Amino acid sequence: MGLPWYRVHTVELNDPGRLLAVHMMHTALVAGWAGSMALYELAVFDPSDPVLDPMWRQGMFVIPFMTRLGITKSWGGWSITGGTITNPGIWSYEGVAGSHIVFSGLCFLAAIWHWVYWDLEIFCDDRTGKPSLDLPKIFGIHLFLSGVACFGFGAFHVTGLYGPGIWVSDPYGLTGKVQSVNPAWGVEGFDPFVPGGIASHHIAAGTLGILAGLFHLSVRPPQRLYKGLRMGNIETVLSSSSIAAVFFAAFVVAGTMWYGSATTPIELFGPTRYQWDQGYFQQEIYRRVGTGLAENQSLSEAWSKIPEKLAFYDYIGNNPAKGGLFRAGSMDNGDGIAIGWLGHPLIRDKEGRDVFVRRIPTFFETFRVVLDDDDGMVRADVPFRRAESKYSVEQVGVTVEFYGGELNGVSYSDPATVKKYARRAQLGEIFELDRATLKSDGVFRSSPRGWFTFGHASFALLFFFGHIWHGSRTLFRDVFAGIDPDLDAQVEFGAFQKLGDPTTRRQVV
């Protein structure tokens, strides 16, 4: 046809058979990528330490999505929650990956078949004998089927009625596991962090989709609406049902991922930046220590009972906003593989007063080391200019003692060591990190939470403009073609001096 490269899809405009073929090929590519990516991630994933080296630290992207839907076991004999297993069954990580690849192959073959045999009787309009699609009817079919799938997911898969349930955890990401979820039909179902809302919303949305699908199958659109919204034009479908629905969904999931929700557990995707900004895990750690002290435990005992997993969340290296958008690689490639918690440093001045290191804000690369007391008064610092210092570690006589972790009970008083741990305390809890194994460069990376958000927000914006573009094309097709819909005289096209100019010469044929 001699079309330019950016007009490739014009070929499918009036060819229902090949339109179906290209969509099948697209599905084949998506499913094939998903299965192949899963197998690649399984090949490089190390399941040995789910606490300090979880999937999100290793940069896994599709494994977390499989896990949140109920897949936890591998044919390699390991479980995502730790330990070994003997009978993972067909619905393991490898089983799901393989099923996607098989499905991709079948779609590939079907796409080829429909490309070759494009002139099918089912696509022919009985009245005209030309290929055509009843788009409102097809819309009803798709709405009905997607409603059935949506209802089935909420009523059976999520609830565990026929399925595994979904990943559910506590607010601090410590006790996560796959379990069945009861629908939340009260106001609590609108809380984005309540798993029951996932079940109830899918049941409700699925029911609505089924009813709406049946409505569109049984009721024809009015002629005025049909013409006004260009329902006979395939580009209307592209603009609305396809692009608009996808960009809206992409914006929504970018938000639920970045701000956190029950659908994006921190055990699978890592913590959010707001949990660092608000001192979310730090407050919980101090609450637990305070409870222990109230039960007459010693400081050492109280801090030793803090789960290593909780302490690890309270480390800025796990903040998805610390890694640059264009720094490739997993978190482990940045600051290294976490080996162990050194413990919590309690820092005191020579008067025995507890002082606390100010934590670095998310978007700072460097931050002055300042130590405040309980009242927010500056008691010590690491000065830029020693000649003018008043609160330097050496002058104030600061010491540090560790509670919990590997250095439990160890104390330091020499200024160089104290300053070293004060600097590290700016970044939250202190961990020993192995940077040699992966040749980690020490520069923070983002987690899959950050990558997912960036990707979906970017494509949502792109698709939004695509929606405007194709919506305008289909609504104003006659205007763009230069044909006046009210034109009653035959006109020699190309004789116009200016489109829409009533003084332009018209030549009656």
UniProtKB/Swiss-Prot annotation:
<feature type="transmembrane region" description="Helical">
    <location>
        <begin position="237"/>
        <end position="253"/>
    </location>
</feature>
<dbReference type="GO" id="GO:0016168">
    <property type="term" value="F:chlorophyll binding"/>
</dbReference>
<keyword id="KW-0157">Chromophore</keyword>
<keyword id="KW-0604">Photosystem II</keyword>
<keyword id="KW-1133">Transmembrane helix</keyword>
<feature type="transmembrane region" description="Helical">
    <location>
        <begin position="21"/>
        <end position="36"/>
    </location>
</feature>
<keyword id="KW-0793">Thylakoid</keyword>
<dbReference type="GO" id="GO:0045156">
    <property type="term" value="F:electron transporter, transferring electrons within the cyclic electron transport pathway of photosynthesis activity"/>
</dbReference>
<protein>
    <recommendedName>
        <fullName>Photosystem II CP47 reaction center protein</fullName>
    </recommendedName>
</protein>
<dbReference type="InterPro" id="IPR036001">
    <property type="entry name" value="PS_II_antenna-like_sf"/>
</dbReference>
<keyword id="KW-0150">Chloroplast</keyword>
<keyword id="KW-0602">Photosynthesis</keyword>
<keyword id="KW-0148">Chlorophyll</keyword>
<keyword id="KW-0934">Plastid</keyword>
<feature type="transmembrane region" description="Helical">
    <location>
        <begin position="140"/>
        <end position="156"/>
    </location>
</feature>
<dbReference type="GO" id="GO:0009772">
    <property type="term" value="P:photosynthetic electron transport in photosystem II"/>
</dbReference>
<comment type="similarity">
    <text>Belongs to the PsbB/PsbC family. PsbB subfamily.</text>
</comment>
<feature type="transmembrane region" description="Helical">
    <location>
        <begin position="203"/>
        <end position="218"/>
    </location>
</feature>
<comment type="function">
    <text>One of the components of the core complex of photosystem II (PSII). It binds chlorophyll and helps catalyze the primary light-induced photochemical processes of PSII. PSII is a light-driven water:plastoquinone oxidoreductase, using light energy to abstract electrons from H(2)O, generating O(2) and a proton gradient subsequently used for ATP formation.</text>
</comment>
<keyword id="KW-0812">Transmembrane</keyword>
<dbReference type="InterPro" id="IPR017486">
    <property type="entry name" value="PSII_PsbB"/>
</dbReference>
<dbReference type="Pfam" id="PF00421">
    <property type="entry name" value="PSII"/>
</dbReference>
<feature type="transmembrane region" description="Helical">
    <location>
        <begin position="101"/>
        <end position="115"/>
    </location>
</feature>
<dbReference type="GO" id="GO:0009523">
    <property type="term" value="C:photosystem II"/>
</dbReference>
<feature type="transmembrane region" description="Helical">
    <location>
        <begin position="458"/>
        <end position="473"/>
    </location>
</feature>
<comment type="subunit">
    <text>PSII is composed of 1 copy each of membrane proteins PsbA, PsbB, PsbC, PsbD, PsbE, PsbF, PsbH, PsbI, PsbJ, PsbK, PsbL, PsbM, PsbT, PsbX, PsbY, PsbZ, Psb30/Ycf12, at least 3 peripheral proteins of the oxygen-evolving complex and a large number of cofactors. It forms dimeric complexes.</text>
</comment>
<dbReference type="GO" id="GO:0009535">
    <property type="term" value="C:chloroplast thylakoid membrane"/>
</dbReference>
<keyword id="KW-0472">Membrane</keyword>
<dbReference type="InterPro" id="IPR000932">
    <property type="entry name" value="PS_antenna-like"/>
</dbReference>
